[in-house]
Amino acid sequence: MVSNHPKALKVLFFTEMWERMSYYGMRGILVLFMTASIQDGGLDFSNSSASAIYGIYAAAVYLATLPGGWIADNLYGQQKTVLYGGIIIMFGHLILAIPNMSLFYFGLTLVVIGTGLLKPNISALVGGLYENKIDMRESGFTIFYMSINLGSILGFFICGYLGENIGWHYGFGAAGIGMLFGVIQYIL
């Protein structure tokens, strides 16, 4: 039963849900945006160039979790690192929402850095909630994992719809707003 779990699980659940909404929402439209023609608001990259950029981006996100964990352990602590990561992700998505090619790679880089800070540490915070409740840890992580699935579904629908039907930058903007909701919810 959810009521038996620590109250902080709810905060971490919704923070992760909004972060995953922003992450998967942006990822869902990224290659489409890069390969769309300039007349359609895209970057007019070839499929191979867009796929290469996407692959480098995806790999960088996962590699960034290593320094993100180190930064939390040695500099700021997990709670502050999650907050800083969320703010950086939000700005990365909002920069992607600006129709300016020169800002494109900067926005992607911010999302990589922010995700590297947030992702490993929010999971560690969930684990820390159950230091004295080992028997509940598995169900706590199951509940937390549902936030990832829920956020990804929201992201694909919201950012995907806006990106393909209204404009790519609206999809990226929605990802930024989603992360803003996550940051606000985390600090309240």
Located regions from the model:
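Intracellular juxtamembrane helix-capping segments at the cytosolic ends
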Residues: 117-131
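Short amphipathic helix-loop junctions that connect adjacent transmembrane helices
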Residues: 28-49
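Interfacial helix-cap and linker-helix signal at transmembrane-aqueous boundaries
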Residues: 34-35, 71-73, 158-167
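Glycine-rich segments within core transmembrane alpha-helices of 12-TM secondary carriers
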Residues: 61, 136-164, 170-182, 186
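Central cavity-lining transmembrane alpha-helices of secondary-active solute carriers
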Residues: 51-73, 119, 153
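Cytosolic juxtamembrane N-terminal segment immediately preceding the first transmembrane helix
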Residues: 1-24, 29
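Cytoplasmic membrane-interface "Motif A"-like loop-to-helix N-cap segments
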Residues: 74-86, 133
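C-terminal ends and interior cores of transmembrane alpha-helices
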Residues: 84-105
